[in-house]
């Protein structure tokens, strides 16, 4: 019985000791308080994912910039796709997708706490010309995962900022 308890406790402790954590459990201290998101496209999938992740981390996103403790300003959002490889018949075999988000984190007075930074992600997916629907679904799924990665990069900057801001 003691052996089972020891093995069970080791299985619980080892993953956390190596830094492993579940996705979307990146801790951003709630000491950040309230946050205002500024973007030219408030209805984009990226902004929706960012709002969801902030909410999960206990940060309240508000619509009034003047009442917010901090602002995340999305300056530019770029999506790009290009042919990554071609098959022997000269048709597209893979596409490369790129997304870049330029952002600034500012305090309530508008002072830049984190100057212009870029979150970038690049992925390649196989394109099957015989099954356009499945290739389209694959592209959408890859884009969704890319949004999650960009959001993680922005949250990481917020976490580092909040760690450095607290004494």
Protein language model features and the residues they cover:
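Sec-dependent bacterial lipoprotein signal peptides
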Residues: 1-16
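A structural "domain/chain start" motif
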Residues: 14-59, 162-167
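Solvent-exposed, acidic/flexible segments
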Residues: 43, 47, 94-98, 139-151
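Sec/Tat-exported extracytoplasmic proteins
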Residues: 54, 58, 105-109, 129, ...
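Short acidic low-complexity segments
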Residues: 59-70
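Surface-exposed short loop/turn segments
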Residues: 67, 73-118, 122-140
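C-terminal/domain-edge helix-coil "capping" segments
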Residues: 130-167
